Amino acid sequence: MTNGGRNGEENKNLMNGEAKAEPETFAQFLYNKDKGTVLGRTGTSWCQITVFYIIFYIFLSAFFIGCLSIFLRTLDPKVPRFYGKGTIIGVNPGVGYQPWLKENPDSTLIKFNLQDSKSWEPYVKQLDNYLSKYKNTNETRDCGASDNNDALETDTDTFPCRFDLGLFEKANCGAKDQYGYKSGKPCVAVSLNRLIGWRPVNYDDGSVPEEIKGRYKPGSITINCEGATSFDKEHLGKVKYIPETGIDGRYYPYVFVPSYQQPIAMVKFDTIPRNKLVIVECRAYASNIEHDISTRLGMVYFELFVEDKKPVAAPAA
């Protein structure tokens, strides 16, 4: 017998002299009748590993739920864990306005035609919806001129100050006057974003900005609206503020309570030109409100376009 023949016979045997097992096929891996295995495991082995993983994942889930429960207990549902300076919330309130149509959320254009009620009715409806929350006066209280919401921070039994919309009605910026949109003297509601614990800080004597010197009242947030460009400033016309001193500071600080009523001010554009687009820049003023044009900090922009022309009839189908 040649060396090649002897080597071939030796390769078929293990070192202990037993014959090598034939390579297992994929079908045999799936189910091996001789060994009684499925996917390489016997029934007993499958039972053992199944029980192990069931117990393992039960303990793992219990550990996760326990950690999550401990974490949630450290959170206050009314106050963010981190807020104020150095946090993403910050200390400088943003400025918002209404009406802002949800159907076109990316647009800051307020455009309507005096001769087409369908064009200005959506703005009236939006303001109706926005101001409807003030009709619920449950768990609120009347606050006098010297009262405020200071007690809300320490006394959970105190109700927040009730915000009265009557001032807007008297100035023809209420629902009965369609907020001025029907007459072409639109009113825009201006408010500050809610920041936990924030309240306006008064200007020092002599440091009140020129833009608001005649209207500034300590304790309030004065609103001032101007045209964004020289063209806009020229055509903006007469602007009326309701109240004249801006947002009343006695409704601060903001505290998370369900019945809290956010203070607002109305800006009425009495002589806005017809058929001209005017870009408006409104700023909120208090000593602790910063302004930054690049990030629009402490200010808000929107466009006004009041048309006065016969609406174009829709083509017949």
UniProtKB/Swiss-Prot annotation:
Major site of localization recorded for this protein: membrane
GO biological process, one term: potassium ion import across plasma membrane
Lineage: superkingdom: Eukaryota
Sugar-bearing residue positions: N138
InterPro entries for the chain: Na/K_ATPase_sub_beta, Na/K_ATPase_sub_beta_sf
MF-aspect GO terms: ATPase activator activity
Disulphide-bridged cysteine pairs: C173-C187, C225-C282
Membrane-side (Lumenal) residue stretches: 72-317
Entry annotated with the keyword Electron transport: no
Cytoplasmic side: 1-50
Any one GO CC term of the record: sodium:potassium-exchanging ATPase complex
Keyword check for Zinc: no
Listed transmembrane segments: 51-71
Keyword terms of this UniProt record: Cell membrane, Disulfide bond, Glycoprotein, Ion transport, Membrane, Potassium, Potassium transport, Signal-anchor, Sodium, Sodium transport, Sodium/potassium transport, Transmembrane, Transmembrane helix, Transport
Function: This is the non-catalytic component of the active enzyme, which catalyzes the hydrolysis of ATP coupled with the exchange of Na(+) and K(+) ions across the plasma membrane. The beta subunit regulates, through assembly of alpha/beta heterodimers, the number of sodium pumps transported to the plasma membrane. Implicated in genomic response to various soil bacteria that affects fitness, lifespan and brood size.
PANTHER family documented for this protein: NA_K-ATPASE BETA SUBUNIT ISOFORM 4-RELATED, SODIUM/POTASSIUM-DEPENDENT ATPASE BETA SUBUNIT
Subunit composition and interactions: The sodium/potassium-transporting ATPase is composed of a catalytic alpha subunit, an auxiliary non-catalytic beta subunit and an additional regulatory subunit.
Family: Belongs to the X(+)/potassium ATPases subunit beta family.
Protein name per the record: Probable sodium/potassium-transporting ATPase subunit beta-3
Organism this protein belongs to: Caenorhabditis elegans
